[in-house]
Amino acid sequence: MKKFIGMALAAVISASSFTALAAGAIPDHQGTSMDGIEIGTAQLNSAVKSYYDLFEQAGDQYGVDPNLLAAICMQESSGRNLSYRDDGSEYPAWGIMQIENTLEKSFAKFGEDTTGEKWTLQDRLDPTKAVPFAAYLISQSLIRYDCDYIKMIQSYNFGQTVLDRIIAAKGND
């Protein structure tokens, strides 16, 4: 996990001129701690870079650094829109942001709230829908976990329910 975090944040930090990833974007944000995060040398490929306008739009709307969205996209799918994770899990993930079936209800509600139309799981393959939803999830995780970027990345990777169970069992560290 430490390698994943380092790779994801390396792409963010190497492409970003910001000193704090969400400074001012999240209510009561007190700054960003990078303690314990190793910076790697991951690069974004051309497929991920082709979605950068979407990352900027969604990032602006939800207070998430577009470079963080790009880094997560790179890690999750390498920008391959038809990417499908079939690892034997009953909850496969699809699209450039690897949105899982478990998020079906919240994805549909997000679509209805933002566009007036309930989105289906098939809509995960539409980057214009998947990227804003991912930005929304990230912004909500940053609020929920008090701007703890490690927990936000873990929440995106494992799912909020799994992370909350781990925290309940092992503590908040």
Segments and roles (model prediction):
Residues 24-173:
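Catalytic glycan-binding domains that act on GlcNAc-containing polysaccharides
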